[in-house]
Amino acid sequence: MTHDISETPTAPVSRYYTAPDGLKLHVLDWSGPSDAIPVVCLPGLARTAADFSALATRLARTRRVLALDYRGRGLSQWDADWKNYSLAVENADILAVFTAMGVDRATIVGTSRGGLHAMLLSATRPTLLHAVVLNDIGPAIEARGMARIRGYVGKLPAPKSWADAADLARFTMGEQFSGLDAADFEAYARLTFEEKKGVFSTRYDPALLKTLEGLDLSAPLPTMWPQFEGLRDIPTLVIRGANSDLLSAETVDEMARRHPSLEAYVVPGQGHAPLLLDTPSIERVAAFVEGN
């Protein structure tokens, strides 16, 4: 399933910027033609900029692509106060990175939490948004999906080898990702874990779990319909994993009703959130980006 990225135009450059409160933030920067609107990729809750490597390689044929590690994830600095792993603080970080990198307009590709940030930007800085891709996220989130995520974030055992890591990925995500094969789960594991001197760990601060512990999943979760409606005049593509337990088909239908020009794409055999590693998904996103 994984996309061939052998045609990499350039390897990404790691850049570091300072958040408003002084924390170090990491950004991957794929150089590309400067005459096109750049793409900024925002990952999921416990994910990193590296998730977008295959997609960014493809998009960098026609434009610059940036991917951000939120604080406490990837190569960004961990925060001593877990309460700062919040949408509000992260959104301020994103705006600071935009300013530092001289980006005044971009297409946002947001996976899960990254899509929430895209919707928030429609309220906090709408002029930044040229187009938006929402990867398995919408204004309404299913509680059962959040319950599943809360069941593993910050709780994964440390694998002993890459083969063990792939098995753990399959155990954790196999039901959601019924269309993946052994090589796909190994690729996913390598994006989830890091290995230093034989010791494996996740690529995020385990304190992220604390941000989920207080969620009342017995009641409907707060929605973001007003923020989504801020995208009404902005070209928007929503991607849904066919097996997703976080973004329902009914929510996508309602999104289309409120955003008449919304484009939708379903990834078969994948759940929350589609990995954007397969050629059809990558080319669908590329067609949207390059068409806007």
Roles of regions detected by a PLM:
Residues K160-G214:
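Conserved alpha/beta-hydrolase catalytic His-Asp/Glu region
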Residues P20, S53-T57, A67-V109:
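Active-site loop/oxyanion-hole signature of alpha/beta-hydrolase fold enzymes
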Residues Q270-T279:
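Catalytic histidine-centered segment of alpha/beta-hydrolase-like enzymes
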Residues K196-R257:
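Conserved serine/cysteine hydrolase catalytic core
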Residues D69-R73, G138, P268-G271:
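Short beta-to-alpha linker loops that shape the active-site pocket of alpha/beta-hydrolase fold enzymes
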Residues D104-A143:
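Conserved hydrolase catalytic core segment
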Residues L23-W78:
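Conserved HGGG/HGGXW glycine-rich cap/lid loop of the alpha/beta-hydrolase fold
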Residues M1-V39, R61-T62, V103-D104, P280, ...:
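Alpha/beta-hydrolase fold catalytic core
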